[in-house]
A protein has these predicted regions:
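Alpha-helical scaffold domains
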Residues: 1-233
Length: 233
């Protein structure tokens, strides 16, 4: 066995040592795009602690350089290790290597590198690149980063147009568009409302956006009533 294989085996054994059979049964129902035989069953807080322990070790570097992974939790661990990176360029390089292998919404949505907060200008360029991808979860990740970092103090109305310009037949992309605009309505209501009034999205995404928006405590009752009136029958 090579040194690289030994490191990967040790990391995998560590994951299996954290296995929770009941959680596995629960988790595999939430990720229908993932082969249930690849789900170990490690709770997210436990996995995050494991990622913290593994981060910075030679084994972690080898693990991240060895793709594709065999197990769902290995992908999640990979995403969590990327999150801890403090160098922006290194983080982006590892992300671009990893994103093509992301095959489910849960792995996609857990990745939120802290270093992004200090590199907004460069990040916006990458977000546009990710959102122009032909890969479902790369698009979803890019849009989630746009939602996370550019709907508050760094908001510009043009960012709404970036999201509205994404057209897809993929459920997990359209669900992300709905999530984005529901969040935008909560944070930037006046700027976002015309995208609903003018029906800039397909019927399903339009109605899902309204559904998610009216579930938000950040939207007033009056706004919720108006949004309900804009549903496409």
């Amino acid at each position: 066995m090579s040194a690289a294989d030994k490191h990967i085996k040790e990391i995998r054994q560590g994951l299996f040592a954290l296995k929770d059979e009941k959680y596995k049964e629960f988790q595999k129902k939430l990720i229908p795009t993932v082969d249930e035989n690849t789900v170990i069953g490690v709770r997210t807080p436990v996995l995050r602690k494991y990622a913290k322990d593994v981060s910075g070790t030679p084994g972690a570097v080898i693990f991240m350089q060895t793709l594709p992974h065999e197990y769902y939790e290995e992908n999640n661990l990979h995403g969590m290790l990327i999150e801890t990176m403090k160098d922006y360029d290194e983080c982006i390089a590892y992300l671009d290597e990893f994103l093509p292998y992301v095959d489910n919404w849960a792995t996609c949505d857990l990745i939120s590198p802290r270093v992004f907060k200090k590199h907004k200008d460069e990040l916006l360029v990458k977000i546009k690149e990710w959102m122009a991808s032909d890969r479902v979860y790369t698009i979803r990740f890019g849009m989630e980063m746009l939602m996370t970092h550019f709907l508050d103090e760094d908001f510009k109305p043009e960012y709404l147009g970036m999201a509205a310009d994404v057209h897809s037949e993929e459920y997990y992309v359209n669900m992300m568009i709905a999530w984005f605009f529901a969040t935008a309505l909560a944070k930037q209501y006046e700027a976002s409302l015309p995208y609903i009034e003018n029906r800039c999205m397909d019927r399903w995404t339009h109605n899902k956006t309204i559904q998610k928006a009216i579930e938000s405590y950040r939207i007033t009752d009056e706004q919720k009533r108006y949004l309900k009136s804009l549903k496409i029958k």
